[in-house]
Amino acid sequence: MPYRAAWAAQEAAHAEVVAGGEERVLLVEHPPVITFGRRPGGERNLIASTEQLTARGVEIVQSDRGGDITFHGPGQLVAYPIIRLAAHKLTVGGYVHSLEDAVIETLKEFGIAGEKDPAAIGVWVEDQMGALAKIPPMERHS
């Protein structure tokens, strides 16, 4: 699902949940897209120009989520939970930590070791060549 279509679906789901509708999780796979969050300076983290990326079919989107720069692409399952944190007595920080714990436990089921870094939000995994990858949670407040 293209990122902008998923974003529109999230906005619609959010409006329904705020109006008292059922909480839900949207599960999607995006074509190649790089999103920038509200944190300034994300462009510095690109290793190619936006022109080079768009020429290769990578969409560039400025989003309203928190954070910096994120790539989504084929083969990645992206989960967008649309929930009422207050109804579950959760703060944003507590919710993020519970997501991290859930991801670590899920990775264990597949024989993958994931860990948290107190200095950086997200779950870190090491590949067979020793490279680290981050699984970041994103949030949007209403």
Please report, for each region that a protein language model flagged, where it lies by residue:
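N-terminal lobe of the biotin/lipoate ligase/transferase fold
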Residues: 1-134
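Short, intrinsically disordered, charge-balanced linker/junction segments flanking boundaries
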Residues: 135-142
